[in-house]
Amino acid sequence: PDELSVLPNVSEVVTDKRELPDMLSRFGVVDIPTGISEFGNRHRAYVKVQDGCLLRCSYCIIPHVRPDLTSRPQEQIFDEIRRLVDNGYREIVLTGIHLGHYGVDWNWDKPKEKWVRLATLVRQIAEIPGDFRIRLSSIEATEVTRELVAVMAEYPQKICPHLHICLQSGSDEILRRMKRRWSTRTFINRCNLVRENLDYPSFTTDVIVGFPGETEEYFQQTIETVKEAGFSKIHIFPFSARRGTPAADFPEQLSKKEKQARGRELAGVEQQLRKQYFDQLVGKQLRVLVESPLSSEKSVVSSAPS
């Protein structure tokens, strides 16, 4: 900061974002517009509604550097979405470090009947007038609640029947080492809950292959779990040790060759699952979002709600 402050034309150096409002007020900026109104030449916009994570999974550095849960005020979110819809955006993606914990930081001292949850926010957004659809970004299995699924079922034209539910491993033993807070059976049960209430929902996920201590048996358990879940897409990540996380110092680290081999095997399974999912949509009518025309053909690139 000291080196930056002496550079030509530098008036202030902000070392803590919490100081920003006070600093700007010294320059006469007292009302700062929040949110984003444009995302370039796109039809999809991203609205961050939450920050921070408390879970402390053994492989993740985020809770160590951003531990404080912060939910964005609802009116700010609604105003931003209205601006985006007015500017022509037709899909609004709600994002957050731990999206499913939206409202948790407000609920500590409130009776349960007054809690604000993600389902509360999604319902309120779905009731905003306009021709747009809502998509949720990454969410944890235990946050796929009956309340949230009920809201998704109530607004099928507004809320995409798609959930990105983080699995990370399909082995209960590896989940325990990862310090995940649920079992594979809980995960599958939440997927089944969604299937029972929504038409042709799709599930995507993240999986880490080659986590320390992952034997061939544990890896095959992951294969079986992803098959049972029926994902339409899997983001596959070979385990990479993050300095400062417990998993970086775990014994039984796997070789790069083993991790790559397991990644390839899982990718093959993903291709099969992806085909199975899209095969069931053949002949179905879906309302899609047109992304762009294909210049060489009389067709367009579009994205389905799922």
Predicted regions and their residues:
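Conserved N-terminal phosphate-binding loop of PLP-dependent enzymes in the Aspartate aminotransferase
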Residues: 130, 148, 231, 246-249, ...
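Proteins enriched for Cys/Gly/acidic motifs involved in redox and nucleic-acid/cofactor modification
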Residues: 1-105, 117, 163, 185-196, ...
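Hydrophobic, well-ordered secondary-structure elements that form the walls
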Residues: 165, 206, 226, 234, ...
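Short, acidic/polar
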Residues: 217-224
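Contiguous mid-protein beta-loop-alpha structural module that forms a pocket-lining wall or clamp
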Residues: 214, 229-231
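Short, hinge-like loop/turn segments at secondary-structure boundaries
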Residues: 5-9, 30, 110-112, 152-154, ...
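Conserved SAM/AdoMet-binding glycine-rich loop
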Residues: 86-217
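Terminal RNA-binding accessory module
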Residues: 249-306
